[in-house]
Every structure is written in C-alpha cells, then in structure tokens.
C-alpha cells in the first residue's frame, strides 16, 4: 500500500493527499 500511495501521492498530492488523510 505504501508503494502505491507513494507513487500516486507524488503525482497527485492534492487529490490523494486529501483522500488518504
């Protein structure tokens, strides 16, 4: 999970950041 979140978070910090947090 950490790997996927890291890759996605690097590209879309706003979108995924808000979703996961």
From Swiss-Prot:
Name of the protein described by the UniProt record = Protein YadW
Induction or repression: Expressed in both exponential and stationary phase; expression is considerably higher in exponential phase (at protein level).
Source species, domain of life: Bacteria
Recorded source organism is: Escherichia coli (strain K12)
NCBIfam families, alphabetized: small_YadW
């Amino acid at each position: 999970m950490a790997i996927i979140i890291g890759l996605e978070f690097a590209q879309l910090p706003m979108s995924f950041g808000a979703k996961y947090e």
